[in-house]
Amino acid sequence: MAVALGCAIQASLNQGSVFQEYDTDCEVFRQRFRQFQYREAAGPHEAFNKLWELCCQWLKPKMRSKEQILELLVLEQFLTILPTEIETWVREHCPENRERVVSLIEDLQRELEIPEQQVDMHDMLLEELAPVGTAHIPPTMHLESPALQVMGPAQEAPVTEAWIPQAGPPELNYGATGECQNFLDPGYPLPKLDMNFSLENREEPWVKELQDSKEMKQLLDSKIGFEIGIENEEDTSKQKKMETMYPFIVTLEGNALQGPILQKDYVQLENQWETPPEDLQTDLAKLVDQQNPTLGETPENSNLEEPLNPKPHKKKSPGEKPHRCPQCGKCFARKSQLTGHQRIHSGEEPHKCPECGKRFLRSSDLYRHQRLHTGERPYECTVCKKRFTRRSHLIGHQRTHSEEETYKCLECGKSFCHGSSLKRHLKTHTGEKPHRCHNCGKSFSRLTALTLHQRTHTEERPFKCNYCGKSFRQRPSLVIHLRIHTGEKPYKCTHCSKSFRQRAGLIMHQVTHFRGLI
């Protein structure tokens, strides 16, 4: 029966060619990436670029999503922790996803389930018959059970029928292929015992029926017995433990139970089956539970010292904001965001300008402010070469060149680059002026216009020059004033190359050129 188990596994391995329908390029690229050596490159730069190229060929980030790439990495680790023979068998089938991997292992278990039951029934029958027949066996007559050991490069052994002798030859003779030679006919018909019993009925009712049958009584009275040749009890316990833990990877090799070989192979395989890291235990446990809840369970009779008990991993849910401001109750996803927000309540401005001493809440605000002193305009238009201090200003300017005007007024047909510009324009048709001054009752279409107007009543001048101390109501007025101190003249005449601080000065200057033409 053990021969049948080995044949079933070999037949399953031979079916690998049937599943070779998937593209194997992914496996080839994976092996190239894992096996790449530093000595294959001329230097660190070339080695890094080569690894990057091989990784992209394997994972294909432009074609796969993040979840698909993670699935590939988890599948690779899952195959790595499998026993070597099972890993090789699964890779031969080229599984394309986790469902396929789990399905392949389940199919192998189902295919080998019947041979496993046959081996168990055979062992139980020998245990029942051995005490009765051992006393009547000739001294030189021994029926040796074939050795069970971890599947390796074992030769395929065909299933043969065993003849039960009456007087028996001196010993069982095995051929070169491990095939048992047939005994002579004992001279009377022998009953055929059906060994294919289900696991549920291994203790009842077939045992009682077998003991009460007439044929069995004749068999027991004919001085026929069996003797199991086992070297020692330790090998027997190792064999049973092996069959319990790995019932689907045993095969037939040799003609006796070889205790040292069995023990050596078992210890090697047991050492290979290491507990994966905790972060992988959670993902692999979820993978197994989704496909088959019983696949990842530890066998009842196994003596594993540390069974796989994955611990739940706490993850942040999307949109979760655990950091709460104690002053206003506003929540943030990151602690750094909460720290920056709390500076609004405390009035802290840790970032100071070294030129004028002005302080800012954020470092980005300080960086933009320093461009006023340096005159830096890092964002340049590729069409007209005009430069800007902010990227958003450049994007809005580029729309004037591309004529990208997606916002159109339905009243007059005029188009705008920004939705806010269209909204302000619509107020000219409706005459709407929702923003009203409470001091004089004057109304305005824009909130900014109302804010500037209210400063005439309060005499507020919030924009102060750090060079001379002069204050202004509007920020643009301060910017123009600062050009006096910095000497900046951004408006240049295209005819005579003369520069001006204000656009109005450039326009008035250009009139002189036009007068000469007239």
UniProtKB/Swiss-Prot annotation:
Chain ranges of zinc fingers (C2H2-type): 323-345, 351-373, 379-401, 407-429, 435-457, 463-485, 491-513
Gene Ontology BP annotations: regulation of transcription by RNA polymerase II
Ranges where the SCAN box domain occurs: 30-112
The UniProt record lists the keyword Cytoplasm: no
A GO CC term attached to the entry: nucleus
Coiled coil: none
InterPro entries: SCAN_dom (IPR003309), SCAN_sf (IPR038269), Znf_C2H2_sf (IPR036236), Znf_C2H2_type (IPR013087)
Biased composition (Polar residues): 292-304
Keywords: DNA-binding, Metal-binding, Nucleus, Repeat, Transcription, Transcription regulation, Zinc, Zinc-finger
GO-annotated molecular function: DNA-binding transcription factor activity, RNA polymerase II-specific; RNA polymerase II cis-regulatory region sequence-specific DNA binding; zinc ion binding
Subcellular localization(s) per the UniProt record: Nucleus
Segments for region (Disordered): 292-325
Pfam entry (one): zf-C2H2
SUPFAM superfamilies membership: beta-beta-alpha zinc fingers, Retrovirus capsid dimerization domain-like
Purpose of the protein: May be involved in transcriptional regulation.
Family: Belongs to the krueppel C2H2-type zinc-finger protein family.
PANTHER family in alphabetical order: KRUEPPEL-LIKE TRANSCRIPTION FACTOR, ZINC FINGER PROTEIN 384
Name the record gives this protein: Zinc finger protein 449
Organism: Gorilla gorilla gorilla
Source species taxonomy: Eukaryota, Metazoa, Chordata, Craniata, Vertebrata
